């Protein structure tokens, strides 16, 4: 009560913040008459003047008012669009590094030009990030005209662009692109071997469009660059064949947690089935030797019992393609991680693709926190304001609309069964269509949209075939005649190519558009249709002249007439066929109607069999409806139901927030290590010589050998002299009389260290002299970078396994996160030690052949990009696509020859970047990865010389 009383007197925090912007808005408006008088050249010259003022010590804040006035006037002249006062406020919010919540149709794309231009003046580059390539291209071409007018350059980063073009785009003042492309470029840059090959130039300021979709919905989706691993398709197919033979009592499914588990009976049954199918099981199924089989069984169970075709994925052209649960779009190239995608391929009897090994990864949460300043725009952020504040330190500012919202949001209608709900939706569509009201019907999956489409067809409606030329002509003809066309369009993952076109025309009178979730987000639905899109399509074959001008004028007049008819019919009608887990997604759907003061309405139709209702306690509601005497095809409509649903959604949102927060805590551990590795890597590439580092590494290896074989304060008789001799021979490639030295009277540990260091330095100096100083310095850098990359990949895999294991330690009253932090730190220390040893061992054997064989580029194997869920249980998508191997290969280098003291040599081409982890190394080809390393170090082979494979 006190809070509401205080708000009445002082206003809310949002209102107070908005009020603080008003004086600047007034100052910008005061400059407008003066700016109107400027010639185009004088207006464009403002950019040079602003940059000179920055160089003289002024801040960007000092330039905000004149810079915003300049952009507003440039947009008016170039685009014919003038920023409203509320849009100026939105630009100020973005400049301050906050999230501007702006309703659909309020011109977020135009708002971004204000903060983008101002921050681009600093010359550090501004990244404008969108959710797909179409929007990146559209916005860059559309708003790029304003920037070009003002003397700024723009670049576009989309899929398929080569490194040269990427580097030019990043060098521009303003760079447009998708979140995936920016993130992958960061990872790719940190796998390059020369600074000149890197394309990004830092992370100064980013504006993220649809910020909730990218920073919240995709927060659990790390970007991963991977390489191929062993082919296990036969095992997937074998396990898949036994899945249908499981009985209901063999497993449990938890839809809330999106998890499946075998029961005790199921464990015994599956073991019998696997043995009968010929799968080799050592002892009991759950013994350590069978961990891979158990993992594949669990993934096959999830594939069969949790994931549904045409809801979670579709099969297209012999491939399993994931469907984005938030947008309903197909995501070609994305793959589920942890073997789940392979399990789905086996289930659908398509070719099982090999699993992949992670080479580099980062989550969106940690990528976007690289920016010195981050801002975002969306129509729905308030429900996630706490998460934006806690994770990204971003405030959410609710920007008022330019005109009042006239949309009527009606209470939900709840039916007992899905069939009753479907019939009610069709009746509602027929009633609205009879008065020519345009409709957008939102569904949660392809399956649901196609069920509704079939129901529509059974009532005499016909689906528009967008493969036909001029597919919407019949719809336009019906709108002219003011008679229902009985046509409807379906927009789901199967028809994503026509997405923007279908959505843009959803505001034509009588149009019925069925869309999965928020497909088409980013494209405005204007009442009457999209005039620019129609002109572009219908005038494409006309040459400039009177005929084209007449056609243009006729289309514009018709769209104005259609708009008037749509308004008279009540504006756009949003029909929701199911509530989403997140209120934000529901609000996004509602927000498609009522743009720029247009009328509109929205209503959700629900049934007790809907996922949200079924999972979150519809049993009590069903018994209550029975007591109330609810009959078939009757609905209950009450604000109490809306509130109950909202509470259920809040619970889900809170749970998802906790999951994302927990993931971030673990990922922060890896992120700290990633930053160290990437920073060190860049420093190595920047230095002309790593001589000092190599010397330190060699000294470190000597210290490690002494510590390993000479116990502290022990007499020489207790030293492992033979082990030390073998270790020195392996790690430093010198054979020394260490056993004899140890027998000398009065020799100490320090004496031994000094002799080893001197011998190692002299041997390496002789090798440098033979190979040449310049060549050696170059080879040193390449070998260090290769060794670091390989060990980092192994480290990522180890951390992933560690993360899966530490969760069980909570049962022993130990904090899993602290356990993870502690062991991850120890593993990182081991990585540094392994880097020293691997680099020193290779460099002590290197001989350079100066005539490389023709065609040798030193690289084999492909790499793939992946974005996928953290941990195997979340089942999120990963993004995978073939990459050019040359982008990662170090510059061509002659084959390296490794020799030992006996004089024998072996020529070795540059190690392949994507070699299998299990490929044997050199003379240790028959050593098991978990056996002691033959070098005598006492370590397991995989952590010693096995790390060099």
Swiss-Prot record:
Alphabetical keyword list: ATP-binding, Cell inner membrane, Cell membrane, Cytoplasm, Membrane, Metal-binding, Nucleotide-binding, Protein transport, Translocase, Translocation, Transport, Zinc
Entry's cofactor comment: May bind 1 zinc ion per subunit.
Transmembrane segments: none
Pfam families for this protein: P-loop_SecA (PF21090), SEC-C (PF02810), SecA_DEAD (PF07517), SecA_PP_bind (PF01043), SecA_SW (PF07516)
Biological process, per Gene Ontology: intracellular protein transmembrane transport; protein import; protein targeting; protein transport by the Sec complex
Reactions mediated catalytically: ATP + H2O + cellular proteinSide 1 = ADP + phosphate + cellular proteinSide 2
Signal peptide region: none
GO CC annotations, alphabetized: cell envelope Sec protein transport complex; cytosol; plasma membrane
Highest rank taxon of the organism: Bacteria
UniProt main location, coarse: membrane
EC number: 7.4.2.8
Membrane topology: Peripheral membrane protein
InterPro entries: Helicase_ATP-bd (IPR014001), P-loop_NTPase (IPR027417), SEC_C_motif (IPR004027), SecA (IPR000185), SecA_CS (IPR020937), SecA_DEAD (IPR011115), SecA_motor_DEAD (IPR014018), SecA_preprotein_X-link_dom (IPR011130)
SUPFAM superfamilies: Helical scaffold and wing domains of SecA, P-loop containing nucleoside triphosphate hydrolases, Pre-protein crosslinking domain of SecA
Binding site for Zn(2+): 933, 935, 944-945
Subcellular location as annotated: Cell inner membrane; Cytoplasm
GO MF terms, alphabetically ordered: ATP binding; metal ion binding; protein-exporting ATPase activity
Binding locations of ATP: 87, 105-109, 524
Cofactor(s) for this UniProt protein: Zn(2+)
Record region (Disordered): 852-876, 896-939
Family: Belongs to the SecA family.
Cited function: Part of the Sec protein translocase complex. Interacts with the SecYEG preprotein conducting channel. Has a central role in coupling the hydrolysis of ATP to the transfer of proteins into and across the cell membrane, serving both as a receptor for the preprotein-SecB complex and as an ATP-driven molecular motor driving the stepwise translocation of polypeptide chains across the membrane.
UniProt subunit comment: Monomer and homodimer. Part of the essential Sec protein translocation apparatus which comprises SecA, SecYEG and auxiliary proteins SecDF-YajC and YidC.
Protein name: Protein translocase subunit SecA
Organism: Methylocella silvestris (strain DSM 15510 / CIP 108128 / LMG 27833 / NCIMB 13906 / BL2)
Encoding gene (name): secA
């Amino acid at each position: 009560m006190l809070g509401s009383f205080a708000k009445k007197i002082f206003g809310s925090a949002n209102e107070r913040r908005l009020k603080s912007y008003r004086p600047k808005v007034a100052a910008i408006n005061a400059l407008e008459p003066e700016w109107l008088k400027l010639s185009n050249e004088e207006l464009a010259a403002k950019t040079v003047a602003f940059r000179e003022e920055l160089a003289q010590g002024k801040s960007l804040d000092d330039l905000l008012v004149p810079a915003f006035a300049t952009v507003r006037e440039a947009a008016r002249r170039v685009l014919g669009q003038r920023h409203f006062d509320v849009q100026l406020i939105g630009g100020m919010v973005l400049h301050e590094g906050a999230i501007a919540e702006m309703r659909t149709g309020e011109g977020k794309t135009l708002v971004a030009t204000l903060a983008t231009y101002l921050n681009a003046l600093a010359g550090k580059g501004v990244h404008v990030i969108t959710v797909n390539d179409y929007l990146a291209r559209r916005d860059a071409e559309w708003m790029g005209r304003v920037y070009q007018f003002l003397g700024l350059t723009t670049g576009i980063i989309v899929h398929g662009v080569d490194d040269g073009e990427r580097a030019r785009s990043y060098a521009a003042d303003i760079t447009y692109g998708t979140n995936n492309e920016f993130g992958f470029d960061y990872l790719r840059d940190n796998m390059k071997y020369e600074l000149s090959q890197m394309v990004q130039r830092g992370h100064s300021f980013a504006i993220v469009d649809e910020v909730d979709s990218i920073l919240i919905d995709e927060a659990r989706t790390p970007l991963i660059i991977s390489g191929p691993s062993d082919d296990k398709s036969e095992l997937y197919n074998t396990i898949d064949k036994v899945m249908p033979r499981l009985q209901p009592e063999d497993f449990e499914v938890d839809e809330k947690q999106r998890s499946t588990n075998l029961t005790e009976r199921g464990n015994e049954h599956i073991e019998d089935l696997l043995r009968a199918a010929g799968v080799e099981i050592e002892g009991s199924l759950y013994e350590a030797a069978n961990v891979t089989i158990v993992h594949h069984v669990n993934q096959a169970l999830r594939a069969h019992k949790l994931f549904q075709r045409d809801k979670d994925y579709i099969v297209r052209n012999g491939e399993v393609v994931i469907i984005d649960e938030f947008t309903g779009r197909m995501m070609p190239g994305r793959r589920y991680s942890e073997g789940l995608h392979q399990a789905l391929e086996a289930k659908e009897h398509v070719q099982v693709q090999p699993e992949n090994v992670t080479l580099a990864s980062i989550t969106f949460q940690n990528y976007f926190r690289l920016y010195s300043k981050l801002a975002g725009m969306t129509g729905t952020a308030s429900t996630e304001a706490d998460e934006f504040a806690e994770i990204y330190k971003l405030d959410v500012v609710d920007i008022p609309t330019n005109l009042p919202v006239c949309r009527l949001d009606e209470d939900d209608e709840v039916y007992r069964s899905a069939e009753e709900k479907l019939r009610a939706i069709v009746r509602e569509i027929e009633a609205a269509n009879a008065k020519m009201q345009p409709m957008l019907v939102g569904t949660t999956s392809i399956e649901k949209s196609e069920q509704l489409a079939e129901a529509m067809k059974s009532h005499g409606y016909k689906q528009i075939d967008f493969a036909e030329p001029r597919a919407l002509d019949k719809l336009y003809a019906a709108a002219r005649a003011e008679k229902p066309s009985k046509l409807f369009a379906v927009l789901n993952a199967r028809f994503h190519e026509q997405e923007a076109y279908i959505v843009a025309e959803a505001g034509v009178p009588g149009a019925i558009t069925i869309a999965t979730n928020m497909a088409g987000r980013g494209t405005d639905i204007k009442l009457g249709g999209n005039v620019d899109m129609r002109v572009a399509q219908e005038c494409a074959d006309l040459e400039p002249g009177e005929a084209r001008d007449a056609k243009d004028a006729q289309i514009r007049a018709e769209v104005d007439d259609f708009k008037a008819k749509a308004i008279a019919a009540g504006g756009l009608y949003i029909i929701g066929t199911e509530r989403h887990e997140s209120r934000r997604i529901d609000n996004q759907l509602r927000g498609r109607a009522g743009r720029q003061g247009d009328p509109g309405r929205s209503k959700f139709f629900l049934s007790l069999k809907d996922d949200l209702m079924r999972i979150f306690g519809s049993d009590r509601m069903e018994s209550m409806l029975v007591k109330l005497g609810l009959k078939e095809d009757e609905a209950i409509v009450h604000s109490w139901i809306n509130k109950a649903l909202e509470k259920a959604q809040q619970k889900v949102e809170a749970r998802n927030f906790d999951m994302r927060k927990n993931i971030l805590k673990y990922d922060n551990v890896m992120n700290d290590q990633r930053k160290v590795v990437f920073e060190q890597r860049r420093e190595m590439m920047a230095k002309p010589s790593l001589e000092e580092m190599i010397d330190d590494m060699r000294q470190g290896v000597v210290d490690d050998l002494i510590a390993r074989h000479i116990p502290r304060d022990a007499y020489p008789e207790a030293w492992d002299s033979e082990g030390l001799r073998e270790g020195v021979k392996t790690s430093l490639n010198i054979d020394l009389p260490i056993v004899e030295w140890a027998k000398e009277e009065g020799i100490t540990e320090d004496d031994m260290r000094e002799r080893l260091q001197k011998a190692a330095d002299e041997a390496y100096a002789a090798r440098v002299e033979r190979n040449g100083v310049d060549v050696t310095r170059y080879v040193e850098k390449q070998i260090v970078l290769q060794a670091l990359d390989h060990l980092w990949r192994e480290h990522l895999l180890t951390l992933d396994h560690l993360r899966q294991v530490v969760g069980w330690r909570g049962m022993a009253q130990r904090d899993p996160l602290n356990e993870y932090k502690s062991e991850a730190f120890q593993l990182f220390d081991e990585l540094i030690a392994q880097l020293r040893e691997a680099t020193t061992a290779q460099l002590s054997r290197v001989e350079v052949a100066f005539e490389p064989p023709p065609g040798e580029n030193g690289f084999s194997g492909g790499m793939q990009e992946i974005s996928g869920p953290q941990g195997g249980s979340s089942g999120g998508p990963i993004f995978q696509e073939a990459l050019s191997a040359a982008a990662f290969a170090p510059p061509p280098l002659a084959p390296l020859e490794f020799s030992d003291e006996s004089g024998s040599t072996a020529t070795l081409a540059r190690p392949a970047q994507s070699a299998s982890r299990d490929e044997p190394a050199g003379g240790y080809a028959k050593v098991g990865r978990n056996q002691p390393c033959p070098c005598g170090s006492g370590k397991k082979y995989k952590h010693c010389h096995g790390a060099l494979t």
